[in-house]
Swiss-Prot record:
Antigen-presenting protein that binds self and non-self lipid and glycolipid antigens and presents them to T-cell receptors on natural killer T-cells. Pfam families: C1-set (PF07654), MHC_I_3 (PF16497). Gene3D superfamilies: Immunoglobulins, MHC class I-like antigen recognition-like. The keyword Magnesium does not apply. Residues 223-232 are cytoplasmic. One of its GO terms (cellular component) is endosome membrane. During protein synthesis and maturation, CD1 family members bind endogenous lipids that are replaced by lipid or glycolipid antigens when the proteins are internalized and pass through endosomes or lysosomes, before trafficking back to the cell surface. Interaction with saposin C is required for the loading of bacterial lipid antigens onto CD1B in the lysosome. It comes from Ovis aries. PROSITE patterns: IG_LIKE. This is T-cell surface glycoprotein CD1b-3.
């Protein structure tokens, strides 16, 4: 009984048990029990091991529990078979989620004016998964001091959103860029330029492409006119 171990009511017993998957796919199971906030005993290699903090009570407890091999067999089965099987099942079910990679989208905007002659540059990054991401305001290859990162916010589709801001003088904004590093991008970082460089593509689409279409239409009109005159 409890009197044999000199336990007095009331007392607090704490315990933790589980299994861990280590590198090389080795699974280590454990069970540790505490008494009154101190380490008491642990189950290792199919046997009860008293902890030094447990003193003589822990030693007597292990002697006592060893007499009941049925109890140790149940504990051993739970630790060596049931727990690892459950762990591998959970990992297998969540493998797709663990390896899930979703590329981020990024865009730039300006925030509320910090003061006269100053701009608040905002780099938005959204739709990425997993959560770890690095977003930097850069000038060339130099990361800019004063970059402020907001909280990473969970989207409705379980991807993430982040905004990173930089307060600069209006005359110093040209040439700055926002760089996004994420595991889904590999070595292909997203780089968005503030100012004119970011509009080069829009200029091409808005001016060059319509001009080409106009030239093609004129060429077709002249060709049809020439063909008609040839027939006559």
């Amino acid at each position: 009984g409890l009197q044999e171990f000199q336990f007095e009511y009331p007392f607090v017993i704490q315990g933790i048990a589980g299994c861990e998957l280590h590198s090389g796919k080795a699974i280590q199971s454990f069970l540790r029990a505490g008494f009154e906030g101190l380490d008491f005993v642990s189950i290792e290699n199919h046997s009860c091991v008293p902890e030094p903090e447990g003193g003589s009570e822990a030693q007597w407890f292990c002697v006592f529990i060893t007499q009941y091999q049925g109890i140790l067999a149940i504990i051993d089965r739970l630790l060596s078979k049931t727990c690892p099987r459950y762990l591998l099942g959970v990992l297998d079910a969540g493998k797709a989620e663990l390896h899930r990679q979703v590329k981020p989208e990024a865009w730039l905007s300006s925030g509320p004016t910090p003061g006269p002659g100053r701009l608040l540059l905002v780099c938005h990054v959204s739709g990425f998964y997993p959560k770890p991401v690095r977003v930097m305001w850069m000038r060339g290859e130099q990361e800019q001091p004063g970059t402020q990162q907001g909280n990473i916010i969970l989207n409705a589709d379980w991807t993430w959103y982040l905004r990173v801001t930089l307060d600069v003088a209006a005359g110093e904004a040209a040439g700055l860029s926002c760089r996004v590093k994420h595991s889904s991008l590999g070595d292909q970082d997203i780089i968005l330029y503030w100012g004119h460089p970011m509009y080069i593509g829009l200029i091409f689409v808005a001016i060059i492409v319509p001009s080409l279409i106009l030239l093609i239409c004129l060429a077709l009109w002249f060709w049809r006119r020439w063909s008609y005159q040839t027939v006559l």
